[in-house]
């Protein structure tokens, strides 16, 4: 089979850096999908992406489709002539060109023909055009007078098969083997001689590393080297590194400085300025303290690097001066003073202002603190003030610092440490895998804030539907549940939801409590799925309706102890025997009239379970409880072997059925074992 390497390059205006990898992956996927549809084989695929180009190299692409035998099944041979003639006509042949063939035990007419495989070079224009059109682009652009759309205007197109140019016209461009170098070096134009040498040619002639991962590794290495030269450690944020890599074709890393006076500003502000606005990497000294220095990546190697450094230092100096001004101005007014301004900030239509939300968080934080034993006064105070930083100049400029700046301002106002820290960390966890607040007051306010949003939005009928979750309530609920589980808080979730709904007064529909609870349970299901807990185990616990998520967790953990061992088999066997006896019974009770029991086995079982019930009634050591319940197996077996449950004595029969039901209730105090079968 003859093969050649196929190269596609789209030369664009600067592509959006945060979408570069997505665009590259989509183009590669679409291209290989089209080849697979056409049954064109290839040995491997390489993707390349820089700010100005998307490229794909398909190694060992089959040069022609394989010949195929096309067989089409027609009518029965016993069909009317009209049907047979019609089938032949639809195939474009005379009737005598049809063949007869058994399909199962019945004879049919078939049309068979040999289809010669098409040459790959004749298919590539359509393949590439389809691959480009199928790239998902949120905001496509149109340019020139062409009826063509793409994420950015495309200025050149390379399509090569081996060393030959593939003739094609796509997006108004004629394919060639000509590419371009760096924009800032007179944009040299040169040829790609052979598809397989694409990466090597760009590196040698234009110093452009088109492989995203290799370019990223080069940048990382240079950053580490520059930091070492500054006797520092660079903090390399992976998402920032990806973004910077998507901004440069020829990376040149350098460091710069700013005045140490700016270190008086909270370091989160400095880092945000460097990272979010300037795309800089910050450095720490040997003691782990933030330095008044930064690392940046230029898109060219300058003959006079000092010019680039001076320019960057001038820009960040201006940025930090603004931040210093915000910091000084914001400290002039306390968070409490700003509460009035919160009343002018809308939280959500029908749910009032941010001031209303702050008051609800204050009430709910006090309630939660009382339940779990946290400081009610500090929790309530932090809840009231936690949103006041939203009306500060600093948070107006750096929205990602909300909460963090509130903590600094609270401390500046003279609020105690517990209140200040709780305010600073109450947004945590912000995303999956994020750390939880470190203080109990922070945990309390975080729960209150998240639950207030969830109950409010559900209460006005705008909860998540299907795949749509515009207010990120699923993520919020998962964060809330993580706090309760990982902090081991014994909180009744139904009561907590009711308290939150009541805090909204008449604004929301309080009948939504059950919907919210079910929503939270589904998020809990997702949490355990992620942690590879069997859904049978989850459903077994869910069936007994524990209302505390942490209590739910303890039951899950207990059942997991017994999976895949003999004790689980014993559990299932006990449950099966009990269920078989009780499945058609009604009017059951767990109150046993032991005065009518006559057999030793039933008396022994009742006495043992009565003693055990007292031991486990208030115990949340469910693993121990289950072990003690499993230990009843021999007594239960003896009861079933020696006692006739369905006796003619109605009173005795009822007592025995109630005894069995009583035993079942003890097992249900942990979970419904029937779900494990």
From Swiss-Prot:
PROSITE patterns: AA_TRNA_LIGASE_II_GLYAB. It comes from the Bacteria. GO terms for molecular function: arginine-tRNA ligase activity; ATP binding; glycine-tRNA ligase activity. InterPro entries: DALR_anticod-bd, Gly-tRNA-synth_bsu, Gly-tRNA-synth_heterodimer. It is found in: Cytoplasm. Tetramer of two alpha and two beta subunits. This is Glycine--tRNA ligase beta subunit. The lineage of its organism: Bacteria, Pseudomonadati, Pseudomonadota, Gammaproteobacteria, Candidatus Pseudothioglobaceae.
């Amino acid at each position: 089979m003859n093969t050649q390497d196929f190269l596609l390059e789209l030369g664009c205006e600067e592509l959006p850096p945060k979408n570069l990898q997505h665009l590259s992956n989509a183009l590669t996927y679409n291209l290989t999908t089209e080849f697979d549809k056409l049954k064109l084989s290839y040995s491997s695929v390489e993707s390349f992406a820089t700010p100005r180009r998307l490229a794909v190299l398909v190694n060992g692409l089959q040069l022609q489709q394989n010949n195929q035998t096309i067989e089409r099944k027609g009518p029965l041979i016993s069909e009317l002539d009209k049907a047979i003639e019609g089938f032949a006509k639809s195939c474009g042949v005379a009737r005598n060109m049809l063949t007869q063939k058994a399909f199962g035990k019945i004879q049919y007419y078939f049309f068979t023909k040999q289809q010669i495989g098409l040459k790959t070079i004749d298919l590539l224009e359509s393949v590439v055009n389809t691959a480009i059109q199928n790239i998902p682009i949120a905001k496509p652009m149109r340019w020139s007078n062409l009826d063509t759309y793409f994420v950015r205007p495309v200025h050149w197109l390379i399509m090569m098969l081996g060393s030959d140019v593939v003739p094609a016209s796509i997006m108004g461009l004629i394919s060639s083997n000509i590419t371009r170098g760096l924009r800032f070096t007179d944009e040299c134009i040169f040829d790609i001689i052979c598809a397989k040498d694409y990466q090597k040619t760009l590196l040698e002639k234009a110093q452009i590393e088109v492989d995203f991962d290799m370019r990223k590794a080069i940048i990382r290495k240079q950053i580490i080297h520059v930091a070492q030269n500054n006797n520092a450690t660079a903090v390399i944020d992976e998402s920032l590194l990806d973004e910077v890599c998507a901004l440069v074709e020829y990376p040149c890393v350098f460091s710069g400085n700013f005045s140490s006076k700016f270190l008086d500003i909270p370091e989160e502000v400095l880092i945000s300025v460097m990272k979010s606005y300037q795309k800089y990497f910050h450095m720490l000294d040997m003691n782990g303290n933030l330095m008044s220095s930064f690392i940046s990546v230029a898109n060219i190697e300058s003959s006079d690097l000092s010019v680039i450094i001076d320019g960057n230092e001038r820009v960040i100096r201006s940025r930090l001066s603004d931040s210093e001004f915000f910091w000084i101005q914001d400290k002039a007014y306390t968070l409490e003073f700003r509460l009035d301004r919160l009343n002018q900030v809308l939280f959500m239509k029908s749910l009032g202002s941010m001031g209303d939300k702050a008051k609800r968080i204050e009430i709910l934080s006090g309630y939660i603190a009382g339940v779990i034993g946290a400081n009610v006064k500090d929790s309530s105070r932090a809840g009231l003030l936690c949103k006041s930083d939203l009306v500060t100049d600093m948070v107006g400029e750096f929205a990602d610092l909300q909460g963090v700046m509130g903590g600094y301002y609270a401390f500046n106002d003279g609020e105690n440490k517990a209140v200040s820290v709780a305010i600073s960390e109450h947004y945590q966890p912000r995303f999956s895998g994020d750390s939880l607040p470190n203080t109990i007051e922070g945990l309390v306010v975080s729960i209150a804030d998240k639950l207030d949003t969830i109950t409010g939005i559900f209460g006005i009928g705008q909860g998540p539907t299907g795949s749509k979750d515009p207010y990120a309530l699923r993520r919020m609920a998962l964060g809330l549940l993580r706090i309760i589980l990982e902090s081991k808080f014994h909180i009744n979730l139904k009561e907590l939801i009711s308290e939150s709904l009541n805090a909204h007064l008449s604004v929301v529909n309080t009948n939504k409590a059950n919907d919210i609870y079910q929503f939270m349970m589904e998020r809990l299901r997702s949490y355990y799925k992620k942690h590879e807990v069997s859904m049978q185990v989850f459903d077994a616990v869910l069936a007994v309706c524990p209302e505390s998520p942490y209590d739910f967790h303890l039951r899950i953990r207990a059942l997991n102890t017994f999976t895949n061992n003999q004790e689980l088999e014993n559990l299932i066997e006990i449950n099966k025997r009990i269920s078989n006896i009780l499945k058609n019974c009604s009017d059951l009770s767990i109150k046993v009239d032991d005065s009518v029991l006559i057999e030793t086995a039933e008396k022994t079982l009742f006495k043992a379970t009565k003693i055990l019930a007292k031991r486990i009634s208030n115990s949340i050591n469910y693993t121990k409880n289950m072990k003690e319940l499993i230990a009843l197996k021999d007594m239960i077996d003896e009861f079933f072997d020696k006692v006739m449950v369905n006796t003619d004595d109605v009173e005795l029969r009822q007592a025995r059925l109630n005894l069995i039901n009583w035993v079942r209730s003890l097992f249900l105090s942990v979970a419904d074992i029937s779900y494990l079968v």
